[in-house]
Regions:
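Conserved core of the PLP fold type I
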Residues: 6-161, 166, 172-190, 194, ...
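Conserved glycine-rich beta-strand-loop-beta hairpin in the small C-terminal domain of fold type I
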Residues: 15, 19, 49, 257-272, ...
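Short, conserved charged micro-motifs
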Residues: 302-308, 345-350
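Conserved core segment of the aminotransferase class I/II
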Residues: 189-265
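Short hydrophobic/aromatic beta-strand micro-patches
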Residues: 213, 295-297, 339-341
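Conserved N-terminal helix/loop that builds the PLP phosphate-binding region
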Residues: 1-6, 114, 314, 360
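PLP-dependent enzyme catalytic core of the Aspartate aminotransferase-like
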Residues: 314-315, 329-363
Length: 363
């Protein structure tokens, strides 16, 4: 019989996560991040992995497990709107930390944390922050990435004030620098980092398979959450991905990732060329270091919402106003997010040419 027939039948009947896929992913995480907790006892935060129905599914389960009404959580604005939509219904207090073109500003985080004493973390009544959520590479929407030094400072603050770090890193494999930045997972000596990875940006978003890496006690609870909610991620897509990864091997997988990154790097260069050509003097931006987004500030217009959502759409330009990435989405914002994931260089050029004309008409 064909080689997939017997394993696939057994696999679909058992309806459990594919053990071979979990094993492959664990080896990959060790190769890429070398987590200090890999050989820890389970009670001390030993690294573990579970498969989720996309990284967003895993993150939502973590939020639901950890957050109670009135809890304090930390994140930097602007932030992925899906994260805000997942956190707001839980009734937590979202405390924002300032960021710039290099990600979260450690001094801003220190200032926020100065409201508490480090020993307050041992007293539940003091309500110290439970976790810091961050997208460290190619942040959506800004395209910025945290520097290694800032990550180290942030991790030390997490140790000092005893909060967890949720490292949402779907664009990790789309870093444009040849040397990938060290991750929070790679420096986690305490078992306080929960890392979310995704296949959506490097294989297909429709597969809806991601994976969480973190301390075993927390990962086991995510698995329990899955068993009583989504039951399990699609066994069929798990099998497809597992067969593909095992056929590629680690070297083949990383070669595929490099080809995908080359594509996005070329897309980024094309969008920047169009921006330089048409938006110079009208807007400003920082060059993204990873991911698929450009964060643009239009000069002289305090709120671009109508320009982007109405006027631009009529000209067949599809972008998002910056306001949707803030807790108060009704507040005016001069920013918009452009994506270079799928448009051709010619389409990017035409879009920014039309946008430039709209900006001039609005000034």
């Amino acid at each position: 019989p064909p080689p997939l027939q017997q394993p696939s039948v057994c696999f679909l009947r058992l309806r459990i996560p594919h053990i071979e896929l979990l094993s492959w992913l664990k080896q990959l995480q060790v190769k890429l991040h070398n987590p200090p907790t890999i050989n820890y006892p389970a009670s001390q935060g030993q690294m573990d992995i579970c498969i989720t129905s996309g990284s967003q599914d895993g993150l939502c389960k973590v939020f639901e497990m950890m957050v109670n009404p009135g809890d304090n959580v930390l994140l930097n604005e602007p932030v992925y709107s899906g994260t805000l939509q997942a956190l707001k219904p839980l009734g937590c207090n979202i405390i924002t930390v300032a960021s710039d073109e290099y990600g979260i500003i450690p001094n801003s985080l220190k200032e926020v944390l100065s409201k508490w004493k480090p020993e307050n973390s041992k007293n539940p009544k003091k309500n110290t922050p439970k976790f810091l959520y961050t997208v460290p590479n190619g942040n959506n929407p800004t395209g910025t990435s945290l520097t290694s030094n800032r990550k180290e400072e942030i991790y030390e603050l997490a140790r000092k004030y005893d909060f967890l770090i949720i490292e949402d890193d779907p664009y990790y494999f789309l870093q444009f620098s040849k040397s990938w930045a060290p991750t929070f997972l790679s420096m986690d000596i305490d078992g306080r980092v929960i890392r979310a990875d995704s296949f959506s940006k490097i294989l297909s978003s429709g597969l809806r398979i991601g994976f969480l890496t973190g301390p075993k006690p927390l990962i086991e609870r995510v698995v329990l959450h899955t068993q009583v909610s989504t039951v399990h991620s699609s066994t069929f897509t798990q099998l497809l991905i597992s067969q593909l990864l095992h056929q590629w091997g680690e070297e083949g997988f990383l070669a595929h990732v490099e080809r995908v990154t080359d594509f996005y790097r070329n897309q980024k260069d094309a969008l920047l060329a169009a921006a330089d050509k048409w938006l110079s003097g009208l807007a400003e931006w920082h060059v993204p270091t990873a991911g698929m987004f450009l964060w643009v500030k239009i000069k002289g217009i305090s709120d671009v919402k109508q320009l982007i959502e109405e006027k631009a759409v009529k000209k067949e330009i599809l972008m998002l106003p910056g306001s949707v990435f803030y807790i108060d989405s009704s507040a005016p914002s001069p920013y918009f997010r452009a994506s270079f994931s799928s448009a051709s260089p010619e389409q990017m050029d035409i879009a920014f040419q039309r946008l430039a004309q709209l900006i001039k008409e609005s000034l």
